[in-house]
Amino acid sequence: MAPRKRTQNAKSKKNPKAPKLEAFLLDFDDEVHTIVERLKEKTNNLLKDADNLYKTALIKLPMAVRKMNWIEYCNLEKPKSPVDDSKVREEAAQVELAIAGNHTIPKVAAKEAKSSANSEDENMAPLKSTMKKKKASKKAPSTSKKPRTLSISKQGGTIQRTTRKPLITPARSFLDSSIIGATPLITPRFDPRLPKTPALRSALHREKVYSMSVNGSPLSAGGEDIVISVPIGNGECIQLLASEMDSVDLSQLDEKALRSIRNLQNRLTTLCGSSK
């Protein structure tokens, strides 16, 4: 005989969506529970804030009014001897100073400020997103590419001439390199009779001086011989060596040079006399 077929019960079949549904319901219950707890906490905070505001308003009232019950306060008529307004103001000012000393800020005002700031941020966010979308739509690049030759042809067919001067090179001899003229082949000799420049100055006392001859070679003062510079005018001066002083002919010097030598002689005599 052939084996008997197994009969499957519909109740024994497992639905694959059942565990997902159970997990979704558990998550939904947890989320609802957390939302309910937050709402309860907010209600408790609002009740505490209302109680604190009620107490602060009650403290500002005068003592005579605080001792009354609600029935007396509601049926209150103007008394024959009214409370002095100045005393009421003084008590209210003292209470306000005491409250300010504690630096207590009601939570309702802070929460209202936060909620208003959040609402403003939420209102500004969609505006910014729409502005960005508009800008992006305006700056959308065009897919059509134009050849380079067309862009060049649109700039204009006329050729603009540049106003720059051509470069001056040694090969281009027809142009002068300066206003004065071409550079001479031989450098001219230095003329001491040229006008003095603003930077020209006389040597200071005990200052190191490096002189130069008329031929253009520098003169070093490395020897042991004493050198005396005598000015003769027109920016020129003569160097006299102490070793060859006997061979100097003073008649060849002008009056200014002789006057300078006599002045130097007098100064040296006074210097040597004071040293003794």
Curated annotation (Swiss-Prot):
InterPro entries on file: Borealin_C, Borealin_N, Cell_div_borealin
GO cellular component annotations of the record: chromosome passenger complex; chromosome, centromeric region; cytoplasm; nucleus; spindle midzone
GO BP, one annotated term: heart development
Ranges for region Disordered: 111-158
Main subcellular localisation: nucleus
TM stretches of this protein: none
Compartments where found: Nucleus; Chromosome, Centromere; Cytoplasm, Cytoskeleton, Spindle
Keyword vocabulary terms for this entry: Cell cycle, Cell division, Centromere, Chromosome, Cytoplasm, Cytoskeleton, Mitosis, Nucleus
Subunit structure: Component of the CPC complex.
Family: Belongs to the borealin family.
Protein role: Component of the chromosomal passenger complex (CPC), a complex that acts as a key regulator of mitosis. The CPC complex has essential functions at the centromere in ensuring correct chromosome alignment and segregation and is required for chromatin-induced microtubule stabilization and spindle assembly.
Protein known as: Borealin
Organism: Danio rerio (Zebrafish)
Upper taxonomic lineage: Eukaryota, Metazoa, Chordata, Craniata, Vertebrata
